[in-house]
Amino acid sequence: MNNFGVGFADEYKMSFIMNNSPLLIKSKEFALQIIKVCNTVKQTRKETVLTNQLIRSGTSIGANIREAFYASSKADFIAKLHIALKECSESEYWLELLIESGYYDDKSVLDKCVEVKKLLISSLNTAKQNNE
């Protein structure tokens, strides 16, 4: 056992799950894409208010999903995924504002956000069904 009460087999299992989870993979890809979008907009358009909000919410999605994998209970797991979903929805809003205001024109990042949101909704529904 390590200092956190998790044995080696549990750590290995969690590492495997985390490295192969489509939700974690997609949310990390999205976070990296958000960082690039925000850097581009800051450099080319000198806009910081929207991008600061977007970078916070867009990178927090994956962080909350990762936290969920180490939740202390099923209810905690569901709560963390729900926070990630709210952050995803917020990111979608900031992206819509950036795109519709003309600060950014590549809608593929918005498509990625919607993809992550759908995965989160599906994961939440499954987790809630398994918790009943």
Residue ranges and their predicted role:
Residues M1-E67, A71-E132:
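Short, C-terminally biased terminal segments at protein or domain edges
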